[in-house]
């Protein structure tokens, strides 16, 4: 029988060939086991190298953690076993409360007296600014979840304290996952990114404003520069909307060239804007996005007689064969680097072209090799989900700057991910921004560990 206060443990760094019956002898010495479950991928059924363990008694869990956590390395593993409370049990987030709309004059003791009737309080802290002035909010941590819930039920919205603008707010404090998501949203807002859905399905109104609104041109530059959040078709739409001289990796605004075709309608409804071959040829040679260079534009162009929808909603109509240096193919070549990150979007683009540009077939293999950035620009990412590949971590870290390379380390014998990777930026600021935003970020059961690669690690990346 499990005790009410039993602890659920997370067990990490276990060999993938060990199942529950193999692991039980290791843990049974500390007490009776209530439940032991190896974690497997829900799609492939593959062992993920970790497990959940619950003892019948809380004391057994504490003994196992004390004796085993980072103390013993199991056969075939490079790092010692991890034994610690599972996220849902451990961090007090289900018993820590955020209290808002306090009066500025209330102290820690005032808040403690308010919450003491509901149970034993471990912590009570009023948040203050650098000058010592109260911010009008506090954190209160109870010993149990039940006590915290009782306080919420009784106090939330129940009164308006002196000096407060509205009624008292009492709720559970944000979890680390929620804080990580908020940090990501703040980064996205600072970079001026949009929701891909909003961009695609709001394309018509964006085109309508693009003729006269310079702000839309700035937004288009940011969208193209941070195109990890878009599909290639939407990026083409941004290029038409702006018709700029150059898009550089930092989103610096370039000079518009010509006005786009007016949006006309014979039935009173908007029609998708069109892009002709002549207009595309007017777009100058360089379309450099996130540090990748495009194919230089040539003057040998065969104009197309068909309208091409570029708003990310309608697929291209198939075209008859044209000259090899068709400008649309050149623009498409500049986006080839994103097909790994967007396999679904790639399917929308590829039917438009009869054959891939020859220059892509001649790309030297050495360009695909792992490259490092300058010192202070390279970061390690640990605890990646098993299914993550190079393209996933590339997509994850592109918002923070120009990525020189992104690599997930793979076991040569099994061809399975080792659950850590390496990303190189071209400047230290981007690396620090990535660490600040992504360290501790939780993906499923994984909490990322992101840290700078130091020179001493150069010959020992593991």
Curated annotation (Swiss-Prot):
Protein origin, superkingdom: Eukaryota
UniProt-listed GO biological process terms: mRNA splice site recognition; positive regulation of mRNA splicing, via spliceosome; regulation of alternative mRNA splicing, via spliceosome
Alphabetized Gene3D superfamilies for the sequence: 3.30.70.330
Subcellular location: Nucleus; Cytoplasm
SUPFAM superfamilies assigned to the protein according to its UniProt record, in alphabetical order: RNA-binding domain, RBD
CDD domains cross-referenced by the UniProt entry: RRM1_CELF3_4_5_6 (cd12632), RRM2_CELF3_4_5_6 (cd12635), RRM3_CELF3_4_5_6 (cd12639)
Domain RRM: 7-88, 95-175, 377-455
Gene Ontology MF, one: mRNA binding
Family listed: Belongs to the CELF/BRUNOL family.
Protein name: CUGBP Elav-like family member 3-A
Organism whose genome encodes this protein: Xenopus laevis
């Amino acid at each position: 029988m499990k005790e009410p206060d039993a602890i659920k443990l997370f067990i990490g760094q276990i060999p993938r060939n060990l199942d529950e019956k193999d692991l039980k002898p290791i843990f049974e010495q500390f007490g009776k086991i209530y439940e032991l479950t190896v974690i497997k991928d829900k799609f492939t059924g593959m062992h993920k190298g970790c497990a959940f363990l619950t003892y019948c008694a809380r004391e057994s869990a504490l003994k196992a953690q004390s004796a085993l956590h980072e103390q013993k390395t199991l056969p075939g593993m490079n790092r010692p076993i991890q034994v610690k409370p599972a996220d849902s049990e451990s961090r007090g987030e289900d018993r820590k409360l955020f209290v808002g709309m306090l009066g500025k004059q209330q102290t820690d003791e005032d808040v403690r007296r308010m919450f003491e009737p509901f149970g034993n309080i471990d912590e009570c802290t009023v948040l203050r600014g650098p000058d010592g002035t109260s911010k009008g909010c506090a954190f209160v941590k109870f010993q149990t979840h039940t006590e915290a819930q009782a306080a919420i039920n009784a106090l939330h919205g129940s009164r308006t304290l002196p000096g407060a603008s509205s009624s008292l707010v009492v709720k559970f404090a944000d979890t680390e996952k929620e804080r990580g998501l908020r940090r990501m949203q703040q980064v996205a807002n600072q970079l001026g990114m949009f929701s891909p859905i909003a961009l695609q399905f709001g394309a018509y109104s964006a085109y309508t404003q693009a003729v006269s609104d310079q702000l839309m041109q700035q937004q288009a530059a940011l969208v193209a520069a941070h195109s990890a959040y878009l599909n290639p078709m939407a990026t083409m739409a941004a290029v038409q909307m702006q018709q700029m001289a150059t898009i550089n990796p930092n989103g610096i605004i370039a000079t518009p060239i010509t006005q786009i075709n007016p949006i006309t309608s014979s039935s009173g409804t908007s029609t998708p804007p069109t892009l002709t071959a002549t207009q595309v040829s007017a777009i100058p040679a360089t379309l450099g996005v996130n540090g990748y260079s495009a194919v230089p534009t040539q003057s040998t162009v065969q104009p197309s007689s068909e309208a091409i929808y570029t708003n990310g909603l309608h697929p291209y109509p198939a075209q008859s064969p044209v000259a090899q240096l068709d400008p649309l193919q050149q623009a498409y070549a500049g986006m080839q680097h994103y097909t790994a990150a967007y396999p679904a979007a790639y399917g929308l683009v590829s039917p438009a072209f009869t054959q891939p540009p020859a220059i892509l077939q001649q790309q030297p293999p050495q360009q695909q090799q792992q490259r490092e950035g300058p010192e202070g620009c390279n970061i390690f990412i640990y605890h990646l989900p098993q299914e993550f590949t190079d393209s996933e971590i590339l997509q994850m870290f592109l918002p923070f700057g120009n990525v020189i390379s992104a690599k997930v380390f793979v076991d040569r014998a099994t061809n399975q991910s080792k659950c850590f990777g390496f990303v190189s930026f071209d400047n230290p600021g981007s690396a620090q921004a990535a660490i600040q935003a992504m360290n501790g970020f939780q993906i499923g059961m994984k909490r990322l560990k992101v840290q700078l690669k130091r020179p001493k690690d150069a010959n020992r990346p593991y």
